[in-house]
C-alpha cells in the first residue's frame, strides 16, 4: 500500500451516522450482524442511531494490522440474513465480502469505506477509498500505531 488514510473517531462517527440515515426506516430490520472486529464499531453506532438492540457477530479473520492473509470463519450468526444489516468497516479486495454474501444472502450488506475491487459486493457504503490506500482506523491508533496489549 503506497498511501495511508487516517480516520479519526469524529470522522468515523460522522460517516457511520450517515450510513444509519440510509438504513431508515429502522422498523424494517430485525437486527445487525457485525463483522468482527472492524464492523463492531459501526455496528455500535448503527445500533444506537436506529434503536436496534439485537446485535450478532460473524467473526472472520483476514488481516493482521497491515497484512491480508487467509480467510478463517471463527464464528457465524445463525441466520440467512433476512431482515438483518451486516456491517463492516471496509470492503477492500472483496474476499471477506464474498464469504459474507454466501453466508447471509438475504442480508443488507453495508460498509463505511469501500475500495474499487470490493465496492460492487456491498449494498451501500459511504466513502470511496483508492485501492492502493491503507486505512488507519481510530481503534488502531494512539499518537501512532499502538499494538494490542496481548502482543506485548
Curated annotation (Swiss-Prot):
5-phospho-alpha-D-ribose 1-diphosphate binds at residues 37-38, 88-96. This is Xanthine-guanine phosphoribosyltransferase. It is found in: Cell inner membrane. The keyword Transferase applies. Mg(2+) binds at residue 89. Pathway: Purine metabolism; GMP biosynthesis via salvage pathway; GMP from guanine: step 1/1; Purine metabolism; XMP biosynthesis via salvage pathway; XMP from xanthine: step 1/1. It is a peripheral membrane protein. It comes from Actinobacillus succinogenes (strain ATCC 55618 / DSM 22257 / CCUG 43843 / 130Z). Keywords: Cell inner membrane, Cell membrane, Glycosyltransferase, Magnesium, Membrane, Metal-binding, Purine salvage, Transferase. InterPro entries: PRibTrfase_dom, PRTase-like, Xanthine_Guanine_PRibTrfase. It comes from the Bacteria. Purine salvage pathway enzyme that catalyzes the transfer of the ribosyl-5-phosphate group from 5-phospho-alpha-D-ribose 1-diphosphate (PRPP) to the N9 position of the 6-oxopurines guanine and xanthine to form the corresponding ribonucleotides GMP (guanosine 5'-monophosphate) and XMP (xanthosine 5'-monophosphate), with the release of PPi. To a lesser extent, also acts on hypoxanthine. PANTHER family: XANTHINE PHOSPHORIBOSYLTRANSFERASE, XANTHINE-GUANINE PHOSPHORIBOSYLTRANSFERASE. GO terms for cellular component: cytosol; plasma membrane. It catalyses: GMP + diphosphate = guanine + 5-phospho-alpha-D-ribose 1-diphosphate; XMP + diphosphate = xanthine + 5-phospho-alpha-D-ribose 1-diphosphate; IMP + diphosphate = hypoxanthine + 5-phospho-alpha-D-ribose 1-diphosphate. It is an enzyme of class 2 (transferase). One of its GO terms (molecular function) is xanthine phosphoribosyltransferase activity. Its cofactor is Mg(2+). Guanine binds at residues 92, 135. One of its GO terms (biological process) is XMP salvage. GMP binds at residues 92-96, 134-135. Gene3D superfamilies: 3.40.50.2020. Homotetramer. Xanthine binds at residues 92, 135.
Amino acid at each position: 500500500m503506497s498511501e495511508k488514510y487516517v480516520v479519526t473517531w469524529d470522522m468515523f462517527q460522522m460517516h457511520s451516522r450517515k450510513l444509519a440515515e440510509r438504513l431508515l426506516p429502522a422498523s424494517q430490520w430485525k437486527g445487525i450482524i457485525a463483522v468482527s472486529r472492524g464492523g463492531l464499531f459501526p455496528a455500535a453506532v448503527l445500533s444506537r442511531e436506529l434503536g436496534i438492540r439485537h446485535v450478532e457477530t460473524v467473526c472472520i479473520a483476514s488481516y493482521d494490522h497491515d497484512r491480508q492473509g487467509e480467510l478463517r470463519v471463527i464464528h457465524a450468526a445463525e441466520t440467512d440474513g433476512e431482515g438483518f444489516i451486516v456491517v463492516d468497516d471496509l470492503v477492500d479486495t472483496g474476499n471477506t465480502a464474498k464469504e459474507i454474501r454466501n453466508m447471509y444472502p438475504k442480508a443488507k450488506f453495508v460498509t463505511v469505506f469501500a475500495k474499487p475491487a470490493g465496492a460492487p459486493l456491498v449494498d451501500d457504503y459511504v466513502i470511496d477509498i483508492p485501492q492502493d490506500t491503507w486505512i488507519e482506523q481510530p481503534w488502531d491508533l494512539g499518537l501512532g500505531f499502538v499494538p494490542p496489549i496481548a502482543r506485548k
